[in-house]
Amino acid sequence: MNIITLTPGQLSLSQLHDIWRHPVQICLDASAIDSINASVACVNDIVAEGRTAYGINTGFGLLAQTRIADEDLQNLQRSLVLSHAAGVGDPLDDAMVRLIMVLKINSLARGFSGIRLSVIEALIALVNAGVYPLIPAKGSVGASGDLAPLAHLSLTLLGEGKARWQGEWLPAQTALKKAGLEPVALAAKEGLALLNGTQASTAFALRGLFEAQELFASAVVCGALTTEAVLGSRRPFDARIHAARGQQGQIDAARLFRHLLTETSAIAESHHHCNKVQDPYSLRCQPQVMGACLTQLRQTKEVLLVEANAVSDNPLVFADAGEVISGGNFHAEPVAMAADNLALAIAEIGALSERRIALMMDKHMSQLPPFLVKNGGVNSGFMIAQVTAAALASENKALAHPHSVDSLPTSANQEDHVSMAPAAGRRLWEMAANTRGVIAVEWLAACQGIDLREGLTSSPLLEQARQALREQVAHYTQDRFFAPDIACATALLAQGALQRLVPDFM
């Protein structure tokens, strides 16, 4: 099991990916302890001196003007968690819950939240023991933070709600006991510190980014395969074309295509002296389109990596000045906009792939048998597989609608502009599944097309891509039940079967 020594605010993208993919053991770096303790001391001083500070000894939201008596401060924090755990929908899977928990730990341990080290350590203990709170997928608008999801996370700390341990849903008290853990009691400000933040929104969008990286790589490989299958030209990938424009994403995408295709192949030599002048845009403009998508992936990475290491609590404790200041770092607008831009890239990756599939279906464009099968008429070949790809690509056009421009006031208009970042991130998962289905069909089709160039082979890397599929899915000599082949190709893509052929591009 991977062990991560957490220096707050310094998680890398590769660490975040590992946390999402696999159970981890978290160890908090000792350098964080002093700032954590200092922020708690500042909160304690405010309570002892009788000063009024939001979230410490006041109500919340529109009730912020209500002063809370000292004897009710613990109950205030517990009541906050219980009342805000109002999410709905299917439970998030363990991977997503684990990522949210580590993001929360990372933020709290920065030392601006006024939460005791013992509470942070209790969260770390949940992660290390594999106790995953039941967090419903829906219920946050991404300001004031992800209140409902993070409240459900916090319930388990209190011994309330449900949690999963070793694959079984249990009452939280039972799960804690089986894992050798105890519930905690919250002190002043701690409930609010746990609930305020963009950790669910950020985790949702990070999963979308991780899946988009796999989709981008897979689509580049399949685009190169299709270029070979339909006797496309390598000339549009010439580095000089892309340097003349200067768009870095485009330059780098073209480099990936050159890496995969190499200078030539037996297939390329077979049509070296053909009469074709230009290929259709879905082949010729791959570096331009995929390069633009790559730029979006990179920009999304920058935003999300900052947010994953950010302090998005409110109010913030500045212990060196003895101040507690209310602000708006809980507003997840940066995450929402990043997710919206990523949605465009995921949709376009699938849309371009679908157009290449359609090209292969047309015997005049592909110079292959109609629908990639011999004895057409008796056999329909890839006819309906292309329709499926079209349906998936079309769904993504609607799903790509921006969420960050939507807002509904909440909390009696106190919270009158929200980000909708959770929905913006969560829909990326469905979009990624759709695009993966499209790319799976293209992989099947392109390999079939190359098979039909009998006696000819592609470049070494593209032959590896074809072999990876052919080890699981046979060539089509006649019609057969098609859906299992799409499912198999889709599963292989999700496992990184094609991604591993592509050098790092992020």
Curated annotation (Swiss-Prot):
Q: Where in the cell is it found?
A: Cytoplasm
The record's section on Gene3D superfamilies has: Fumarase/aspartase (Central domain), Fumarase/aspartase (N-terminal domain)
Q: Does the keyword Cytoplasm apply?
A: yes
SUPFAM superfamilies hit by this protein: L-aspartase-like
- Identify the domain of life: Bacteria
Residue(s) carrying 2,3-didehydroalanine (Ser): 144
**Entry-linked InterPro entries:** Aromatic_Lyase, Fumarase/histidase_N, HutH, L-Aspartase-like, Phe/His_NH3-lyase_AS
Q: Which processes are annotated in GO (biological process)?
A: L-histidine catabolic process to glutamate and formamide; L-histidine catabolic process to glutamate and formate
Point out the cross-link 5-imidazolinone (Ala-Gly) in this chain.
143-145
Q: What UniProt keywords are attached to this protein's entry? A: Cytoplasm, Histidine metabolism, Lyase
Pathway field? Amino-acid degradation; L-histidine degradation into L-glutamate; N-formimidoyl-L-glutamate from L-histidine: step 1/3
Family under the similarity heading: Belongs to the PAL/histidase family.
What is the protein named? Answer: Histidine ammonia-lyase
Q: Gene behind this chain?
A: hutH
